[in-house]
């Protein structure tokens, strides 16, 4: 087993850690066996060298080992819409809104998320304002998935080992490997995923990581405007993993009949504003907010293997919104989470 000192010297020299070495090192970090100085040095060493696909996959594997898992009785069409965040765009909660639409279309959405990192509100912030009980046990989240096809996994409830790293990350104030691990560590082990990323380089990297981790159908996306979603401002970069193969391409919103818009049309400066925009979309209000939700929900439906193509996914998303079923999913989650959580 590699020592922290040897690992750090390897990173300083610009050399990659082997997969098994990264596994061992990450387990030490997650158990709190390294000093804060050692952990901080290794995290920054990885960042400066630039984390490799193998290193990220090993770290994600360990985080999954240490996570509190959600029991799921039916794994068909199980999808997550969790992105990295960190795009500093201050848009409303697009992926959270899309989750309700995808669930209404028949996907089983195991939504993983937390509080705000760099935006005005994270998924947990807006769901809490809507009245969803976040403090459910893993078994209760599994019950939500079984009964209504939608469950929210509040990250701190499932990744308690992060307590060893959280103060170090806060004190560093810099991005580390942990900024990209969240969407790779779904506690329900969803192997279908729509993941937005904050940097274009991560599109190819995360798709290869998820291939190593055994995912089935995934789209990793990054908008030309920096958005960690499929954007309406112009083309989005996409890496799609399906049947063990990765295809990289650009996706234009016009291909699906959506007009271009600017990021300011999607802005929400507070969690309350984000909640209001989410509700407006679910209530059927037309405009850019609805359009971007349709596009991203369509992608989630497609990656869940409910729809045979992204275009068909968008059509199903539109039907789910127009029928009122997406709004009903929100109401069902509020009611069931409150009932289960007492």
Curated annotation (Swiss-Prot):
Listed EC numbers: 2.4.2.18
Binding site for 5-phospho-alpha-D-ribose 1-diphosphate: 83, 86-87, 91, 93-96, 111-119, 123
Residues that hold Mg(2+) 1 according to the record: 95, 229
Cofactor dependence: Mg(2+)
Record: residues binding anthranilate 1: 83
A GO MF term: magnesium ion binding
Residues reported in the UniProt entry to bind Mg(2+) 2: 228-229
Amino acids binding anthranilate 2: 169
GO biological process, one term: L-tryptophan biosynthetic process
Pfam families, A to Z: Glycos_trans_3N, Glycos_transf_3
Lineage: superkingdom: Bacteria
Family of the protein in this entry: Belongs to the anthranilate phosphoribosyltransferase family.
Subunit structure: Homodimer.
Protein name in UniProt: Anthranilate phosphoribosyltransferase
Organism: Chromobacterium violaceum (strain ATCC 12472 / DSM 30191 / JCM 1249 / CCUG 213 / NBRC 12614 / NCIMB 9131 / NCTC 9757 / MK)
